Each structure stands twice: as C-alpha cells, then as structure tokens.
Amino acid sequence: TEAEKKMVEKVKTAFPHVAVVLNVGGMLDTSWFKEDEKISAVLLAWQGGIEGGLAAADILCGDVNPSGKLTDTFAGTLEDYPSSESFHESLDYVNYEEDVYVGYRYFESFPQAKEKVIYPFGYGLSYTTFEISVKDLKVEKDKVSVKAEVTNLGKRAGKEVVQVYYSAPQGKLGKPALELGAFEKSRLLAPGESQTM
C-alpha cells in the first residue's frame, strides 16, 4: 500500500541498510523494491503464523540459514500476470484464462512473459553457496531418475533444494515449456560437505 511504501521511505532515511519483510499471502508488485539500492534485502515470510516473527528474526539475525525457495514467480507488476484481469470478477469462482500455463508455467513458456520476471519460481538465497552436479541420469520406459550431488562451497552450514525440471514433447494440446518434475532438500551440510540425492 502507499502507507507501507511511505513507512519504508522513512526507514530508508534513518538507516544505511534496510531489509523488507513481506508478510503476504499472494503476488504483489515487486517493482518498487527490486532496483532500490537502499533496500539491502527482502525476506518473503509468507504467512508464518504465530511463530513467523521469531522465524524471520532468526533469519535476519543470521541464527538460521534460509533454504526456502519461491513457490511462485514474482513479476514486476500485477498486470504482468495473465490472471490479474479476471481474478476478482467473482468471489466464488476463478476462471484461469491462462489454461495450463498457470503460474511459473506461463512465464517459462512465453518469451515476452519471461522478460517480466523479477524473481523466478524456485528462487531462493542462502548465507552460503552450493554447487549442484548431476551424477547419474537414467531413462527407463516412462521413468526418469536423476542423482545429483550437492556440495556446500561456502563458510556456513546450510541446506539446498535440488530442483528437476523437464520439457514434455508438444502434442495436439499445448504444454508448458518447462515443468517442475521433482525436488528434494538436502540435510544440513557443513562447509565442504556433500550429499548425493
């Protein structure tokens, strides 16, 4: 809201580093903070419930290393989402005009939409860095198996989420260009430690 933006502007004048915590339940316009050099960090807390404030504080103070990933795509403005035109027409029915291209599938399938992405589906930061390398890939009839090794290259312990995406052949009906096929989170990896998943 405009009131929240004004509050952030006041905070920015008082502090050299500003972290914005978003306690939201859906998409929002991200254009106002993406390119703002005075906003050092943005933490998406979603709706953490009664312990959400403590969890956010643990992350912001560095007591916990974040390992979450976005469950949706964040575009620059609300108008960048194809559902924004029809979403609030009815209180009890949503017409998904984008068909099978709901959410990240839309942004991955259409080049003009991909350009509007600020934070992609599956995006997330950590206080450490990881390397993910594919160790084995098997295709057996209708099943694909992937083994990946995650290595903590940083100086802090942390967890990483391995995400496997696929592209299905196009048929008579349109299909998204890319879909999430599987994901798995590693255990807590010490610096230099690896895990095969």
What are these regions (language model features)?
Residues 1-37:
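Hydrophobic helix-and-loop "lid/oligomerization" segment in the mid-to-C-terminal part
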Residues 2, 11, 97, 103, ...:
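Generic low-polarity alpha-helical segments
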Residues 9-19, 54-59, 77-82, 183-186:
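Low-complexity, flexible helical/coil segments
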Residues 23-159, 165, 191:
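Secreted, periplasmic, or luminal enzymes acting at the cell surface/secretory milieu
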Residues 35-38, 163-172, 178-181:
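Active/binding-pocket-proximal capping segment
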Residues 172-197:
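Intrinsically disordered, low-complexity Pro/Gly/Ser/Thr-rich segments with frequent PxxP/GP/PP motifs
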